[in-house]
């Protein structure tokens, strides 16, 4: 009888722990992006540094690192920053492969994909944190006439 009671109490305790764990997990995974959302920021690329890794000059394998300020769409106020790196893929095609994190109010948005020297690029939103923890979608990167970059995020849940 005592063994059955001990077993029943242990089973009840495990069930209670499971209920608390499921409730905690479901509360923390509530998506914050529930509809398509846009975010437009402007990067001022003042820290970009190219590291020549092989033959002298622009060659495959060279690295680009950066950590720049992000401004609002009106380009009047700093609203975040980014940090990341790119590897030169093809100098003749003007292509890099990049990944970076954008730090904005409410969380981070990570992107990965190609950067082209002379045309627009579309990168994949690979995830996020905080308000952007369920983010996915794409980011359009466009060079402006002012040696800056428009980052236009199209976020989907």
Task: Describe each region flagged by the PLM.
Residues 1-9:
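Bacterial N-terminal signal peptides that target proteins for export
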Residues 9-19:
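Bacterial N-terminal signal peptides
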Residues 21-24:
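Sec/Tat signal peptide C-region and signal peptidase I cleavage site
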Residues 26-157:
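Beta-strand-enriched cores of mature, soluble protein domains
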